[in-house]
Amino acid sequence: MTDCEYKHTPTDLHRVTSIAFSMGAQELVACATPHIPSAKVDQPYKAGREYAINRSNPRWEQMKPVWLQAVRSMVMLRQGKAAPDVLVFLGDDVPVKTITSRLPDGIDGLDWDVCTGDALKHRLQVKGGRLVTPDGIEYKAFLMVDKAHVNAESQARIDAFREAGVAILHSGESIIRPLEILTHHESVVHTHRRIDNTEIFYLANLEDRTTVVSFRLQDMPKKVRVWHNLSGSRHELKCHNDRTYTLTLHPCESVFFTYSPNAL
């Protein structure tokens, strides 16, 4: 948030927070000051700008909805556990830092983590055809990066995963998405968490206009409850005959919706 300058609008800040939350962030820090910054010719701002957001800025009142949504989102996104769909294997010869250009095709619209050979040896077990970590995170599939270096020990572990029923995928292959955005997918971002038998999805509209989103849920639940972050209002979504749902998102609005797959 400290990379946002005074010229940035509430919409800009909302996009920053929403994309961060969709990528797994659970906490954001905003530096604020009550003083009006005053740059001088011989004493310019460091890095060419003031590092803190000025509370005397005339746009401060306009920013309040952004902070309110961000705080409520942070509280919700700390509940339960992350529910990633696939685990991306980068190889045995790469740093833990993810290089975007090396990510495989097929992960768009999915929640994912990355790993190297160390995780294969020390962090992953198979349960019911899924990869499971010691802290209870489950992955539906294991996706290998093209041309990844795989040593003999890691290859043996991957072969064992396959024999145990884990879906081993390669670049371009994918799985059925738990949440499939059918319309305006370029305008929204989302992430998925789980509390016991309850699925929690965060969905945010990045646009400064009202967006009507149509989506499909793999579990096809009978009841989907929606909580609007800013207004606090709650309601249920009805499933259409084609097994899709429709949700209207106001400009720069984020929501959470929940359901229990086995609920009657």
Where are these regions (language model features)?
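Carbohydrate-binding surfaces of carbohydrate-active enzymes
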Residues: 1-264
